[in-house]
Amino acid sequence: MRDPSSLYAGFPVGSQYESVEPPSLALLSSIYQEQVPAAPGHSYEQCAQPWPPLYREGGTWSPDRGSMHGLSPGTQEGSCTQAEGTKDSLGGDETLSRKSKKKNYHRYAKPPYSYLAMIALVIQNSPEKRLKLSQILKEVSTLFPFFKGDYMGWKDSIRHNLSSNDCFKKVLKDPGKPQAKGNFWTVDVSRIPLDAMKLQNTALTRGGSDYFVQDLAPYILHNYKYEHNVVVYAPHHMPSHASSLPLAEDPHQTNTGGKLNTSFMIDSLLNDLQDVDLPDVPRNIESQRISPAVAINNMWSSAPLLYPQSKPTRNGRGPGFSASHSTYSSSSSSISTISPVGFQETQERSEDLLGRQTQRLGFPTKRPREDDGCSTPSSDTDAGNYSPTEPPKKMPLLSLDLPTSYTKSVAPNVVAPPSVLPFFHFPRFTYYNYGPSPYMTPPYWGFPRPTNPGGDSPRGPQTSLDLDNMLKTVPPNKSVFDVLTSHPGDLVHPSFLGQCLGSSGSPYPSRQGLM
């Protein structure tokens, strides 16, 4: 660890520190004993390290002139190793000698500076302002004794910081061999974060130690000043107005760079939404500021109306409402889009949308609203000036339209059976070998018997399904598939068992066998 007369001493620029005798590490032992562990039986008075002062004649760590020639590695080697060798030669304890051999280096406290600052410090104080990797490692270990000894993990940290920070630039020794080793590294001081050059918050600095320079910027920048109208980390692809902001205007952007102007910012997203046609939202920005009372009362949204098949569907909110939104709203709760009728309606809506593209910028027009089969001109405008407390009127259900969530009367939920025959639990019998069971016959549900009822005798396999007759026998709110699979244990009605399985000579299995 360097003493107060070295780089760690925080003296102002221009001052001179005169020392008759270089202070030893004993002065620092009382401050941070845990950070600088002492070897047993040794005195730090005998291990004084002659560090050159900061502004002494021949010393080179000055902000005005950056040179490292005054710091020779020979003068910075401590005498602790020699003292240990002398004590061992004089017949010291064998246990102590074994411990000293096991730990053959003195572990100093880790310097409270970032690797970026230490690398930039040694590069900027070199004669040519550039160094190789081996030279950087040598100068850092010479300047900070923590990196001496058997600890080698800090070298990987040096390599990582050189390659990951964009302030360090590689200068090829031979441009024809970019992959060759031995290249030089320089530093761009304009891209160094200001916080990276300051004293870091470590356990050593939190202990109240004042023997470290608070800021290494004077020793790295060398009277270089940041331009206040240029952001330090402004990317090259950013617009000019973002990089021309003063650095001191926003305290949060002192070292993190300018504000990113991307498509994910809330301002850009709000600007994009202004050009989107939304339902019940006027395009004027000022008209979007609606009072809370009006917003609460306007709780009824306009529902899509049902129109006859011969007339195309029109938009209910004027040119500001998209026809595609109406198509989505009217078809989201039904399956009419997969039917031929729904396909024709969709095609007619698309043609009507193309015809209305030229009227989007024109004056608002009125449309006739069809209510209960009467086509009367409505007094409402395209902006939808209906009563906010009353729900919109709806068209009655037409025979050609499927029911939706907006219809007042819903037809029975009758659907066609699946194309594949449902699973039958009797593998010995086919689906049509015993004729229609009483469970599926009209008398069981109370319906009138069809004109041509099927006999109870077994039939042969049929080639197709008669959907009309099957749908007539289906009860309300039931489907063919529900009847066949909702109660697997009741597929065979008791009347069927009485008719077909009552006689002992019947070829079919008995009731106990089926159960």
Swiss-Prot record:
Extent of motif Fast/FoxH1 motif 1 (FM1): 402-406
DNA-binding residues: 110-206
Gene Ontology biological-process annotations: activin receptor signaling pathway; cellular response to cytokine stimulus; gastrulation; positive regulation of transcription by RNA polymerase II
GO cellular component: nucleus; transcription regulator complex
Main localization category: nucleus
Top-level division of the source organism's lineage: Eukaryota
InterPro entries associated with the record: Activin_resp_transcr_regulator, FH_FOXH1, Fork_head_dom, TF_fork_head_CS_2, WH-like_DNA-bd_sf, WH_DNA-bd_sf
Keyword RNA-binding attributed: no
Biased composition (Polar residues): 73-84, 375-388
Record localization: Nucleus
Keywords from the UniProt entry: Activator, Developmental protein, DNA-binding, Gastrulation, Nucleus, Transcription, Transcription regulation
Pfam family, one: Forkhead
Biased composition (Low complexity): 322-339
Region (SMAD-interaction domain (SID)): 377-503
GO molecular-function terms, A-Z: DNA-binding transcription factor activity; RNA polymerase II-specific DNA-binding transcription factor binding; SMAD binding; transcription cis-regulatory region binding
Sequence motif Fast/FoxH1 motif 2 (FM2), location on chain: 412-418
The keyword Transcription regulation belongs to this UniProt entry's keyword annotation: yes
Ranges spanned by the short sequence motif SMAD-interaction motif (SIM), renumbered to the chain: 467-488
Region (Disordered) location: 55-103, 307-399
UniProt remark on domains: The FM region is required for binding smad2/smad4 complexes. FM2 is more effective than FM1 and only interacts with phosphorylated smad2 that is in an activated smad complex.
PANTHER family: FORKHEAD BOX PROTEIN H1 (PTHR47316:SF2)
Biological role stated in the UniProt entry: Transcriptional activator. Recognizes and binds to the DNA sequence 5'-TGT[GT][GT]ATT-3'. Upon TGF-beta induction, forms a transcriptionally active complex with smad2 and smad4 called activin-responsive factor 1 (ARF1), which binds a site on the mix-B/mix.2 promoter called the activin response element (ARE). Binds to activated smads and the ARE with much lower affinity than fast3. Necessary for the first steps in mesoderm specification, directly inducing mesodermal genes. Acts with fast3 to control the convergent extension movements of gastrulation.
Oligomer status and interactors: ARF1 contains 2 smad2s, 1 smad4 and 1 foxh1/fast-1 protein. Interaction with smad4 is most likely indirect through interaction with the MH2 domain of smad2. Binds to the MH2 domain of smad3, which can incorporate into the ARF1 complex. The ARF1 and ARF2 complexes are activated by distinct TGF-beta family members; formation of ARF1 is promoted by activin. Interacts (via Fork-head domain) with gtf2ird1/wbscr11 (via repeats 4-5).
Stated name of the protein: Forkhead box protein H1
